[in-house]
Regions:
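Bacterial N-terminal signal peptides that target proteins for export
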Residues: 1-8
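Contiguous beta-strand segments within globular domains
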Residues: 39-63
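Solvent-exposed serine/threonine-rich low-complexity stretches and specific carbohydrate-binding patches
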Residues: 28-38, 87-102
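Exposed low-complexity, polar/acidic, P/S/T/G-rich flexible segments that act as propeptides
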Residues: 59-62, 67, 129-151
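C-terminal motif of bacterial Sec signal peptides marking the signal peptidase cleavage site
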Residues: 15-18
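Bacterial signal peptide processing site
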Residues: 20-22
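Short coil-to-beta strand junction motifs in C2/discoidin
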Residues: 70-78
Length: 151
């Protein structure tokens, strides 16, 4: 494993406070993951996921429901949040670990981000990217992703 890849994975783990494969993340008292999931690929790397507004939002939960990453390329999701008619506010970057396992990721929200999460019609914007900027995404990678705002 290259030093840059190890550093990228370590940074992601610190930002997330850890992540756990198989959807066994930290339990929350929040609403369920959005009933709408999206598929991300190298050909269609970005998507918007409508989520329910949550008062006193503390985090954004991203569920990687399924993942096909046979090449085991290091990948990340660039995540932002916006409300109807608003500008996207970056939330953070996270990725699955191991890189070919479904995962539950949790990104903390600042008070300014939480205000955006109150709506109207908030949505999470996700972008699939290579963990190493100089390496293009493998065209065979496919992720199915859902999201929820948590209190």
């Amino acid at each position: 494993m290259t030093m840059l890849r190890l550093l990228t994975l370590t940074t992601a783990m610190v930002l997330l406070g850890g992540c756990s494969p198989g959807g066994t993340g930290t339990p929350t008292t929040s609403p369920a993951i959005s009933h709408k999931s999206v598929e991300l690929t190298a050909a269609v790397p970005t998507a918007r996921i409508p989520v329910d507004p949550v008062r006193d939002a503390k985090a954004l939960r991203i569920s990687i429901i399924s993942i096909d990453n046979k090449a085991q390329q290091g990948i990340q999701l660039n995540v932002s949040i916006r409300r109807e008619g608003g500008v996207a506010v970056p939330v953070g970057t996270a990725g699955p670990f191991p890189v070919d396992h479904p995962s539950e990721l949790r990104l903390p929200l600042t008070p300014a981000m939480a205000e955006v999460a109150l709506g109207p019609r908030p949505e999470v914007m996700v972008e699939l990217a290579s963990a190493l900027p100089e390496q293009p995404l493998n065209p065979q990678i496919t992720l199915t992703v859902a999201a929820a705002i948590t209190a």
